[in-house]
């Protein structure tokens, strides 16, 4: 007859902790990662399936490098998390079979492999968030006609947020190396607190980026209509949905994770949401690019996204009336053209007044 499990180890060696939670967590993570693989494959296909306009090539190369970075870091995290879960399960099963509880104590207090894997997870998740912020902020900055008063505050907020995340990751790595002392345990709790602040700050920053981007699209559309330029309401609504549905995924995932972790009252959740949050950080910006590219390759929208057809300012001066057709993928160009057209009209009005005075 097997001896009963000591009470202090019962939570670690329960069926839910040692069997159900690892299986459900890995299943959920690989389901989301499988979707990410399909999304990344769609991006690679659409990115190289047709030649981009010359003016968009620098941005295209930037987004390509950032998207590759996001996917590589997400893959590193998936591998590290898998090693962590499998190694922990092996230790738990070995302890249950041999009743060698010293093995469990050594794993929990000072296991070098566990420390390396945990550190790799924390660092890759923060670096992935940095790359995601870079991509989203750059797109927001371009859509806002490269205005520094929009880009600089977002960059500063992102730097502060990710610096907090790096500090939390370093503190947790130091604490996990040896948790046998009270000081190490206190240090680990400090790292957890900083990490919670990092997640909340990241949710706020990404929400601001999403709202600014969607707001600028709406404003540009209104300006286009006010200047008598024809545009597709359906296309604008689609782009707004793209921004809101994909850009807002990351802060929503963070908020849900924080709610689940802090409302379980010691009861383990159905699965660990931490890897889901990390993967969504890569999926959200990638989905924006992919959905925009897929939309630009469908039917009659291809010409609208590929080209910007507009009337030159000289044609206005000669009294010719033509229709402006803008691509939502070139919002900053459309905005600059609207502003330039307004300046031309103002100058023409001033010249007319001077002619009348003479």
Predicted regions and their residues:
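Intrinsic-disorder signature of cytosolic C-terminal tails immediately following the last transmembrane helix
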Residues: 1-358
């Amino acid at each position: 007859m097997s001896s009963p499990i000591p009470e202090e180890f019962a939570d670690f060696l329960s069926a839910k902790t040692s069997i159900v939670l690892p299986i459900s967590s890995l299943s959920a993570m690989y389901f989301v990662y499988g979707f990410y693989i399909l999304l990344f494959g769609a991006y690679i296909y659409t990115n190289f399936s047709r030649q981009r306009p010359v003016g968009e090539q620098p941005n295209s190369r930037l987004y390509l490098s950032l998207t590759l970075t996001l996917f590589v870091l997400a893959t590193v995290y998936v591998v590290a998390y898998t090693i962590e879960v499998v190694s922990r399960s092996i230790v738990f099963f070995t302890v249950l079979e041999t009743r060698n509880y010293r093995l469990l104590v050594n794993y929990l207090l000072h296991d070098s492999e566990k420390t390396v894997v945990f550190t790799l997870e924390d660092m890759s998740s923060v670096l992935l968030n940095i790359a995601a912020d870079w991509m989203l902020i750059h797109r927001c900055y371009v859509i806002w006609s490269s205005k520094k008063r929009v880009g600089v505050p977002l960059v500063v907020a992102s730097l502060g947020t990710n610096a907090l995340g790096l500090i939390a990751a370093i503190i947790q790595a130091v604490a996990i190396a040896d948790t046998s002392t009270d000081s190490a345990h206190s240090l680990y709790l400090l790292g957890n607190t900083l990490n919670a602040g990092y997640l909340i700050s990241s949710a706020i920053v990404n929400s601001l980026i999403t709202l600014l981007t969607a707001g600028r699209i709406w404003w540009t559309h209104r300006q286009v209509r006010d200047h008598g330029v024809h545009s597709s309401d359906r296309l604008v609504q689609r782009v707004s949905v793209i921004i809101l549905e994909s850009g807002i995924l990351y802060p929503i995932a963070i908020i849900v994770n924080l709610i689940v972790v802090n409302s379980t009252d010691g009861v383990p959740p159905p699965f660990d949401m931490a890897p889901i949050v990390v993967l969504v950080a890569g999926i959200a910006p990638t989905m924006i690019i992919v959905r925009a590219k897929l939309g630009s390759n469908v039917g009659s929208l291809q010409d609208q996204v590929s080209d910007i057809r507009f009337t030159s300012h000289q044609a206005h001066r000669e009294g010719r009336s033509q229709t402006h057709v803008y691509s939502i993928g070139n919002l900053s160009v459309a905005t600059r053209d609207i502003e330039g057209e307004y300046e031309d009209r103002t100058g023409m009005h001033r010249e007319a007044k001077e002619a009348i005075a003479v």
